[in-house]
Amino acid sequence: MKINVLKRTKGLLKVEIEGEGHTFGNLMQETLLEDKTVDWAGYDQPHPLFRQSIITIRVKGEAQPEKALERASKKIRADTEEFVEKFSSAIKNEN
């Protein structure tokens, strides 16, 4: 995974994520939209043959889009860890 900042202005951040496609882009978009400071979030995969997502975030007021992206990343990580724990528990309880 490689991240390139394409555009950064007050209240707006656009980043390119090389090596990630729709799965990651959609997950990040959905998680960003749960953040109350985010006004708009979207992703684009410019070409179907290349694993590359472009994520755009626009925030409300004085919020920082970089912080919103950081919070979304941490939430995805926490949700994934919770899933692993619950899945492991479910497998153990099945036996």
Language model features by range: what are they?
Residues 1-95:
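Protein-protein interaction/assembly regions in multi-subunit complexes
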